C-alpha cells in the first residue's frame, strides 16, 4: 500500500487513466474531466458530488497526477463487488424473492455481453445449490463468489 491508502495496482491504473485524459501531454487534466476519469476507475460520483468535490478541493484550474492521487484517495468510492453482483441479480428477481431461475441466468450469460460458453456456464453453476424448482438463492452464490 502506498502512503495514501491506495494499492500499487490502483496507483498504476490511475496513472494509466490519467495519462489517457492528459491529451496535450502537459501532465495536467482539467477539473471538468474528473467525473469521467473517476467513472473510468470504477467510481460512480453524481454530478452534485462532483460539484462538491470541485468546490471543496478548490479545483479551479488543471491539476497534476499527485493532486489527482490525493483526490482519489479521499473521494473515490468504488462499488463493492458483492453489491454489483446483488444489483445484477435483482434485475432478474422481479418479484424480490431472493431467487432467480437458472434458465434465465443461463440465457443471459450465454447470449448477452461477454458471453460464457454453455460449458463454462455449466461449470459455473456447479458452485451453486439449484433447487428442485430450477432456481438458485443468489445470496448464497454471492457469498461464495466474494469468498473466493
Swiss-Prot record:
<dbReference type="InterPro" id="IPR011992">
    <property type="entry name" value="EF-hand-dom_pair"/>
</dbReference>
<feature type="binding site">
    <location>
        <position position="22"/>
    </location>
    <ligand>
        <name>Ca(2+)</name>
    </ligand>
</feature>
<dbReference type="InterPro" id="IPR050230">
    <property type="entry name" value="CALM/Myosin/TropC-like"/>
</dbReference>
<dbReference type="Pfam" id="PF13499">
    <property type="entry name" value="EF-hand_7"/>
</dbReference>
<dbReference type="InterPro" id="IPR002048">
    <property type="entry name" value="EF_hand_dom"/>
</dbReference>
<feature type="binding site">
    <location>
        <position position="26"/>
    </location>
    <ligand>
        <name>Ca(2+)</name>
    </ligand>
</feature>
<feature type="domain" description="EF-hand 2">
    <location>
        <begin position="80"/>
        <end position="115"/>
    </location>
</feature>
<dbReference type="GO" id="GO:0005634">
    <property type="term" value="C:nucleus"/>
</dbReference>
<feature type="domain" description="EF-hand 1">
    <location>
        <begin position="9"/>
        <end position="44"/>
    </location>
</feature>
<comment type="function">
    <text>Potential calcium sensor.</text>
</comment>
<keyword id="KW-0677">Repeat</keyword>
<feature type="domain" description="EF-hand 3">
    <location>
        <begin position="116"/>
        <end position="148"/>
    </location>
</feature>
<dbReference type="GO" id="GO:0005829">
    <property type="term" value="C:cytosol"/>
</dbReference>
<protein>
    <recommendedName>
        <fullName>Probable calcium-binding protein CML14</fullName>
    </recommendedName>
</protein>
<dbReference type="Pfam" id="PF13405">
    <property type="entry name" value="EF-hand_6"/>
</dbReference>
<feature type="binding site">
    <location>
        <position position="24"/>
    </location>
    <ligand>
        <name>Ca(2+)</name>
    </ligand>
</feature>
<dbReference type="GO" id="GO:0005509">
    <property type="term" value="F:calcium ion binding"/>
</dbReference>
<dbReference type="InterPro" id="IPR018247">
    <property type="entry name" value="EF_Hand_1_Ca_BS"/>
</dbReference>
<feature type="binding site">
    <location>
        <position position="28"/>
    </location>
    <ligand>
        <name>Ca(2+)</name>
    </ligand>
</feature>
<feature type="binding site">
    <location>
        <position position="33"/>
    </location>
    <ligand>
        <name>Ca(2+)</name>
    </ligand>
</feature>
<keyword id="KW-0479">Metal-binding</keyword>
<keyword id="KW-0106">Calcium</keyword>
Amino acid at each position: 500500500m502506498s502512503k495514501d491508502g491506495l494499492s500499487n495496482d490502483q496507483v498504476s491504473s490511475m496513472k494509466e487513466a490519467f495519462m489517457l485524459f492528459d491529451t496535450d501531454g502537459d501532465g495536467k487534466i482539467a477539473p471538468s474531466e474528473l467525473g469521467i476519469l473517476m467513472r473510468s476507475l470504477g467510481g460512480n460520483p453524481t454530478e452534485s458530488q462532483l460539484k462538491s468535490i470541485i468546490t471543496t478541493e478548490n479545483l479551479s484550474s488543471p491539476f497534476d497526477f499527485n493532486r489527482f492521487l490525493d483526490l482519489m484517495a479521499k473521494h473515490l468510492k468504488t462499488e463493492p463487488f458483492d453489491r454489483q453482483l446483488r444489483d445484477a441479480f435483482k434485475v432478474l428477481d422481479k418479484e424480490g424473492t431472493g431467487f432467480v431461475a437458472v434458465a434465465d441466468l443461463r440465457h443471459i450469460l450465454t447470449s448477452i455481453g461477454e458471453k460464457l460458453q454453455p460449458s463454462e456456464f455449466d461449470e459455473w453453476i456447479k458452485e451453486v445449490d439449484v433447487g428442485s424448482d430450477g432456481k438458485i438463492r443468489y445470496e448464497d452464490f454471492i457469498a461464495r463468489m466474494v469468498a473466493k
